[in-house]
Amino acid sequence: LKDDYYKVSGGTLEDRGICSYARFAQQTTAPVCSGFLVAPDLLVTAGHCVKGVSNCKNFRWVFDYMVDGSSNVIEQVAVDNVYSCVEVIQRSLSRVSNQDYALIRLDRPVVGRTPVTVRTSGKIADDAQLVIIGHPSGLPTKIADGANVRKNNKRSHFVTNLDSFAGNSGSAVFDANSGL
């Protein structure tokens, strides 16, 4: 491909045994995890996605990995939308505390993107409506809404009926009303 694009390689859900008529079965699956930008060069993902800086350096974080509606196939991504990990600033993966996150520094600031605002105190409302944005099963960006908090009695996490899969690990989950 051209010098300003990377070729996307990966199979499809159909290649993994999903029926060919299933929704998204023909779309390219490449991502292993999801993440979200919290500062120009800082990304949050799941702690089990990044085991350390040497492991993290093997990952690429891609923005605009999505289909435009006219095709199910993503053959290339712009080089400018592909970032590398240079530092794992903080990581936690603990069954005791139920924490599973990593804060990583990217190789350069992400341009043309506004980092998300993260709730830093309190907890989500017991009846909050939720939205998740990520890469379920390695698919291009998907947005799933229509979900809500089901159980909210733990300090570290809540239970929801969000439609998420492997690959959504590290996805941003938003309160549909406040955006936080």
For each predicted feature, which ranges?
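Catalytic nucleophile loop of clan PA
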Residues: 36-37, 164-180
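RNase H-like polynucleotidyl transferase catalytic core
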Residues: 159-162
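Serine endopeptidase catalytic core focused on the charge-relay Asp
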Residues: 1-30, 37-40, 44-157, 175
